[in-house]
C-alpha cells in the first residue's frame, strides 16, 4: 500500500505537470475539460510539495537521477523568470508565461505562505544535489539564490513583529492578513528566521506567531481537547 501511494503521488506531479514550467497544476480534470480555461494555471505551494515527491521518486528509482535533474532544471528556470514580489511568489501563475494569475480580486501579488511551501521544497532539492556532480551543484546554487531573494522582512508591513500573508503591487496591504499561530503556516516563520539575507528578529516569532505565549490556550472542539489556539477561533 505504501509503495502504491508513493508511486501514484509521484506520478501526479511527474506526469501531470504543466509542460512549460514543470510545476504542479492547480487542478487536474481527468476528462480534459476545463470550463474556466485554466488547464495551464500552476500553484506555487503545491509545487513545493510536488518537488519533494519527485525527490522521493528519484530515490525510489521511478525515474533516473538524470531525468529528475532535468525536471528540476526546468522548474528552476521557470521560477527565475516568473513573477515575484519582493522575492515572494504569488499563489498562482500561468504556466506558459510565468505571469501572476490572481487568486482573488486583491490577491495578485506575493503570497508569503505559499512561497514558504515552495521554498521548503526547493531547499530539499538544494540539499539533495549540493554534493553531486557539477550540473547538480550548479542547480543547487541557483536554488540558493532564489532562497536568498525572498524578502521576509518586507512582509512585516513596515517593521511590525508579525508576518503578513499577502502584498499586492496594486492593492498594497489591503488583504490585511497578519498570521498568528497555530496553523499550517509555521514553516513561514521558521524560514523567515533562518534566512541568510532577510532574516527576521526573534520578536517576530515570539510576538507574531506565539503571541507572547497566548498561543497556548487549552480548549475543546466537539469534545476533542486541543492545547494550542488556532487562528480564527
Where are these predicted regions, by residue range?
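Ser/Thr/Asn(+Pro)-rich, low-complexity disordered segments
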Residues: 1-233
Amino acid at each position: 500500500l505504501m509503495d502504491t501511494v508513493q508511486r501514484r503521488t509521484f506520478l501526479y506531479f511527474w506526469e501531470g505537470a504543466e509542460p512549460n514550467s514543470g510545476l504542479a497544476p492547480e487542478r487536474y480534470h481527468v476528462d480534459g475539460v476545463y470550463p474556466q480555461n485554466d488547464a495551464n494555471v500552476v500553484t506555487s505551494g503545491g509545487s513545493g510539495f510536488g518537488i519533494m515527491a519527485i525527490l522521493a521518486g528519484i530515490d525510489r528509482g521511478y525515474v533516473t537521477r538524470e531525468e529528475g535533474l532535468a525536471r528540476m532544471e526546468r522548474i528552476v528556470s521557470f521560477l527565475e523568470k516568473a513573477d515575484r514580489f519582493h522575492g515572494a511568489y504569488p499563489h498562482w501563475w500561468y504556466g506558459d508565461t510565468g505571469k501572476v494569475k490572481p487568486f482573488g480580486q486583491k490577491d495578485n501579488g506575493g503570497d508569503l505562505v505559499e512561497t514558504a511551501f515552495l521554498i521548503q521544497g526547493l531547499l530539499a532539492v538544494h540539499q539533495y544535489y549540493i554534493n553531486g556532480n557539477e550540473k547538480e551543484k550548479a542547480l543547487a546554487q541557483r536554488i540558493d539564490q532564489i532562497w536568498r531573494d525572498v524578502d521576509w522582512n518586507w512582509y512585516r508591513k513596515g517593521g511590525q513583529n508579525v508576518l503578513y500573508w499577502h502584498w499586492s503591487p496594486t492593492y498594497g496591504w489591503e488583504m490585511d492578513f497578519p498570521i498568528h499561530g497555530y496553523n499550517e503556516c509555521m514553516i513561514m516563520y521558521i524560514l523567515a528566521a533562518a534566512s541568510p539575507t532577510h532574516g527576521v528578529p526573534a520578536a517576530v516569532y515570539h510576538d507574531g506567531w506565539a503571541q507572547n505565549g497566548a498561543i497556548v490556550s487549552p480548549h475543546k472542539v466537539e469534545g476533542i481537547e486541543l492545547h494550542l489556539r488556532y487562528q480564527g477561533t
